[in-house]
UniProtKB/Swiss-Prot annotation:
Alphabetized PANTHER family for the sequence: (-)-GERMACRENE D SYNTHASE (PTHR31225:SF221), OS04G0344100 PROTEIN-RELATED (PTHR31225)
Source organism, top-level taxon: Eukaryota
EC number: 4.2.3.-
Disulfide bonds: none
UniProt enzyme class: lyase
Annotated catalysed reactions: (2E,6E)-farnesyl diphosphate = (+)-(E)-beta-caryophyllene + diphosphate
The protein, known as: Beta-caryophyllene synthase
Binding residues for Mg(2+) 2: D313, D317
């Protein structure tokens, strides 16, 4: 059972916390778009379309049963332009998978190159095809260990490392593949004997962010440089990727300009100065979840929701007294403008903004179904209840058991709420079944929330003035901080495996829905892999935002 850090019958403290966050690093920078997307869209759009057709011809001319086709598909995906060729890629990978299934023994026998086998495995798993991990058995000895002679195959080692991140629970050979490839790649980097600088960069990038955890639209710019170093790269594809990046960047500049204006008009900087001012970071969060250009409504809505959820989180963590937080939670459960009267002034401005954001999108979503926004509201209500319970623990000085903590901390991570809200604005391809699926908190959604919660807790340990998974685990198990981190990292790894499992056919919902949840987990990896880069946004995230939203690439 949980414990109190002082006397069991300690009186509730009803005071505000004290935390100071640094101001926005962007201010009004994005208020005026750097370029006019509408004016430049016609001529640039024509050039983009012509370039796209060249890549489409290249895809069609490259034989499916070839390493060249696999590498071309991989490059298209890593350059962030795969949404232009979804049908072509799906057809090619489906043909490859069927060939694997229908002629398994002969096909495996003919494929003896580790790079080819590992790349094919990863591409098929990423597409949802449940290709067997036994395909790697041919590279092991009689004891089931990978042949040491493979260590000199640098490209093969890198492909094996990336493939291992597509594993599910119980795939021992992929666990061994990860250890084996990681060890050998680290040795290769330490020796620094490679003449191929592009391959060195790929290894370093893989250790920082494996492809399975990478947001392609954020990693595309860096990959362009690595891809250009590859002697076999396609100039047509590289040109198209650059044109598409710049074209999309102008659209994103317009979107963040609109959001900056909305945020400035709310004037939370003055009215709620205690809250984190992270509008640009919230937009990039959403851009990671919805990279496809057609989802502008979804990006606009979700950006506002995440920004307001961040403010609400700060109200519960650093501003509200316990009595005020109870009133605020009750008001959110009622979801009625009249409930605003019972709130203190600083809560009213946030509450009104929250209701307005949902009311606006509800009007826009009326054609596709008002039930969509209803589901989204319910997830926000759940989030508020979880925030309140955590606040009650803090005021009582109560440290729950790890299991009890996670039962509340998973919903309070905000990621079940994000999963429910990110489906709003995706168009009529989604149906009520998709929203029902999220509301039931399936394994994939829960795994995404576990990744969010535990990575957030590890990143914020020692800084955030609230109970965390680290504290709960050490108190319950008498463990050291190092042991707690090792356990939590193991749970994060297992959560990724659960997400991989849910991504395999047959799936409960469409790949469109599953990809939103997967992308959401990828955002967390980006933001929290080296500390809390959302709260402390003066870090590498600032440079990344500059690269994605400000600086065009040279054609």
């Amino acid at each position: 059972m949980g414990i109190h850090s002082s006397a069991e019958n300690v009186a509730l403290e009803n005071v505000r916390q004290s935390v100071t966050y640094h101001p926005s690093v962007w201010g009004d920078y994005f208020l005026t778009p750097a370029s006019n997307h509408e004016e430049s869209s016609t001529s640039e759009g024509e050039e983009l379309q012509e370039s796209r057709q060249e890549v489409e011809k290249l895809l069609g001319a490259t034989h499916d049963d070839s390493l060249q086709k696999l590498e071309l598909i991989d490059a298209i995906q890593r350059l962030g332009v795969d949404h232009h060729f979804q049908k072509e890629i799906e057809k090619s990978l489906q043909d490859i998978y069927l060939r694997c299934c229908n002629d398994k023994d002969d096909y495996d026998h003919n494929q003896t190159d580790l790079h080819t086998v590992a790349l094919r495995f990863r591409l098929l798993r990423q597409q949802g095809y449940n290709i067997s991990s036994e395909t790697f058995n041919k590279f092991t000895d009689r004891n089931g260990k990978f042949e040491e002679s493979l260590a000199d195959d640098v490209r093969g080692m890198l492909s094996l490392y990336e493939a291992a991140h597509c594993g599910v629970q119980g795939e021992k050979i992929l666990d061994e593949a990860l250890v084996f490839s990681s060890s050998n790649l680290k040795s290769i980097l330490a020796k620094n004997h490679m003449s191929n600088s592009g391959l060195t960069a790929r290894i370093e990038e893989a250790f920082d962010t494996p492809i399975r955890k990478c947001l392609t639209n954020f990693g595309a710019r860096k990959f362009m440089s690595m891809y250009e170093e590859d002697e076999s790269h396609s100039e047509a594809l590289l040109k198209f990727a650059r044109l598409d990046f710049n074209f999309s960047q102008k659209l994103h500049q317009k979107e963040i300009s609109d959001l900056t204006r909305w945020w400035k008009e709310l004037d939370f900087k003055t009215k709620l100065p205690f809250a984190r001012d992270r509008m640009v970071e919230c937009y990039c969060w959403t851009l990671g979840i919805h990279p496809e250009p057609q989802y502008n409504l979804a990006r606009n809505f979700l950006s506002k929701v995440i920004m307001l959820a961040s403010v609400i989180d700060d109200i519960y963590d650093v501003r509200g007294t316990l009595d005020e937080l109870q009133l605020f939670t009750d008001a959110i459960q009622r979801w009625d403008i009249s409930a605003m009267e019972q709130l203190p002034p600083y809560m009213r401005v946030c509450y009104e903004a929250l209701l307005n954001v949902y009311a606006e999108v509800e009007e826009l979503e009326r054609i596709d179904g008002p039930y969509r926004v209803h589901y989204a509201k319910e997830e926000m209500k759940k989030l508020a209840r979880a925030y309140l319970e955590e606040s009650q623990w803090l005021y009582k000085k109560y440290i729950p058991t790890f299991k009890e903590y996670m039962s509340v901390a998973i919903p309070s991570s905000g990621y079940i709420m994000v999963a429910g809200n990110c489906l709003v604005g995706l168009g009529n391809s989604l149906v009520m079944k998709d929203f029902d699926w999220v509301s039931c908190e399936p394994l994939m959604v829960k795994a995404s929330a576990i990744i969010a919660r535990l990575m957030d807790d590890m990143a914020g340990h020692g800084f955030e003035k609230k109970i965390s998974a680290v504290e709960c685990y050490t108190n319950e198990n008498g463990a050291s901080e190092k042991e707690a981190f090792e356990e939590l990292e193991k749970q994060v790894s297992n959560a990724w495996k659960d997400m991989n499992q849910e991504f395999l056919h047959p799936t409960a919902v469409s790949m469109t829905v599953l990809t939103r949840v997967l992308n959401a987990a990828r955002v967390i990896h980006l933001l929290y892999k080296d500390g809390d880069s959302y709260t402390n946004s003066k870090t590498y995230i600032k440079e990344l935002i500059e690269a994605v939203l400000i600086q065009p690439v040279k054609i």
